[in-house]
């Protein structure tokens, strides 16, 4: 719920990097380029896998990067844990013949509309994955952006988020409980596309 709370503050940018390289770039951006207050969210446990950014990746305001290319649907995620689950979902869906584009969007309350149009150009099915409440997270950010764009407003967006009081347990148990683990996400995406 911190994204919605801090996102409501004027001139406050919220970032959650997916790996050490992006964390370093985010910190450098906040110190050297930002004209506003910045909040960097960091995972408190080791990353479940190394999230590889494209070789030409540059940390650019409101933009992210395609981590897994796909043509049937798009899943936006952020941070090492949720990016891992998004990539697991892409792997499971590939077994079902579904090609899922996974996009890392570290900017949790800002998006570059021109970049978003390019990323979403070939897909009508857009999904978002938040480690946060469904209110005020990346799902709402992208929903607002899609609705404000004549070329994107016909896209269908489905938000996956923590829809109740967060469960206690190991990360795997909590993700599974909320249906945010990779296998559950794959099943939910497949059901939504049917």
PLM-predicted stretches and their roles:
Residues 20, 40, 45:
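Midchain, well-structured core segments that form catalytic/ion-binding scaffolds
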Residues 1-33:
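Conserved thiamine diphosphate
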Residues 37:
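Short, surface-exposed loop/strand segments
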């Amino acid at each position: 719920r911190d994204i919605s709370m801090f996102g409501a503050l004027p001139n406050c940018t919220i970032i959650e990097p997916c790996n050490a390289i992006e964390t370093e770039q985010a910190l450098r951006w906040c110190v050297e380029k930002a004209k506003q207050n910045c909040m960097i969210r960091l995972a408190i446990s080791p990353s479940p896998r190394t999230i590889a950014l494209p070789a030409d990746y540059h940390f650019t305001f409101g933009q992210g990067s395609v981590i897994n290319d796909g043509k049937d649907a798009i899943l936006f995620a952020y941070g090492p844990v949720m990016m891992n689950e998004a990539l697991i979902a892409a792997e499971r869906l590939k077994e079902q013949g579904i090609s899922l584009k996974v996009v890392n969007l570290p900017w949790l309350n800002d998006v570059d509309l021109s970049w978003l149009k390019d990323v979403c150009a070939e897909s009508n099915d857009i999904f978002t994955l938040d480690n946060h409440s469904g209110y005020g997270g990346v799902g709402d950010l992208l929903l607002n952006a899609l609705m404000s764009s004549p070329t994107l407003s016909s896209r269908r967006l489905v938000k996956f988020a923590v829809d109740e009081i967060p469960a206690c347990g190991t990360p795997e148990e909590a993700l599974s409980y909320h249906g945010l683990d990779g296998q559950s996400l794959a099943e939910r995406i497949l059901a939504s596309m049917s």
